[in-house]
């Protein structure tokens, strides 16, 4: 079903697995996509043919809502970044590496973020980290790197900065970030979309 919707886009698109995804199902549905249909345990990849390099990083931890960046994935990232030290780079990953203040979602956060930070401290070419998972738009400066979480394409959660109960779904609009690449850096615009309800 996802592929039929994405095929309506006029732009190229690249996918990373989220916490509800199954790698094998994703590979089967997008077998002709080199960055997904390839071999290997994880769906990590680079896209090199744009003015800024894109790196998709797989944070999936099967059977868990949480994500993980294990040593194997971090070694791959470190090697990949080392091989192109001067190429401006965007990282894409599902689970954000920071504490958001949303207690229920933070319990389902990213394991391995300390080692992830150690890798990134060696690589100043990473200009931004783009994430999902929180079902809310959130931005922070993490390890001196702008880190943005996009809205969900399905449901948004009520902003609850202290409650332990399950997140409440609310009819806020979804949206998207549009990143404008300039010589000075990245400029991010937020576009809210009409609700489909």
Label for each model-derived stretch:
Residues 1-76, 83, 115-125, 143, ...:
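Extended active-site neighborhood of metal-dependent phosphoesterases/phosphodiesterases
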Residues 13-15, 89, 129, 147:
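Hydrophobic/aromatic residues located in beta-strands of well-ordered beta-sheets
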Residues 19-20, 94, 133-135:
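Histidine-centered divalent metal-coordination motifs
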Residues 54-56, 90-92, 130:
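Structural motif
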Residues 63, 102-109, 163-166:
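Short glycine-enriched, charge-decorated loop/helix-capping segments at active-site entrances
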Residues 68, 86-127, 158:
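Active-site-proximal segments of metal-dependent phosphoesterases and phosphodiesterases across multiple
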Residues 174-197:
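A short C-terminal boundary segment appended to hydrolase-like catalytic domains
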């Amino acid at each position: 079903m996802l592929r039929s919707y994405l095929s309506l886009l006029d732009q190229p698109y690249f996918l990373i697995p989220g916490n509800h995804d199954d790698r094998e199902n994703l590979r089967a549905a997008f077998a002709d996509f080199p960055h997904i249909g390839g071999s290997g345990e994880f769906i990590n990849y680079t896209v090199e043919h744009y003015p800024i390099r894109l790196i998709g990083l797989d944070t999936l931890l099967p059977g868990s809502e949480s994500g993980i960046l294990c040593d194997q994935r971090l070694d791959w990232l470190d090697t990949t970044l080392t091989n192109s030290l001067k190429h401006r780079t965007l990282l894409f990953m599902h689970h954000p590496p920071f504490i958001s203040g949303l207690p229920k979602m933070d319990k389902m956060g990213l394991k391995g973020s300390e080692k992830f930070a150690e890798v990134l401290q060696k690589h100043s070419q990473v200009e931004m980290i783009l994430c999902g998972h929180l079902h809310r738009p959130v931005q922070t400066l993490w390890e001196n790197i702008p880190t943005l979480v996009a809205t969900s394409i399905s449901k948004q959660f009520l902003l609850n900065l202290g409650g332990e109960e399950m997140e409440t779904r609310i009819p806020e609009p979804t949206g998207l970030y549009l990143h404008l690449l300039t010589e000075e850096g990245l400029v991010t615009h937020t576009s809210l979309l009409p609700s489909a309800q």
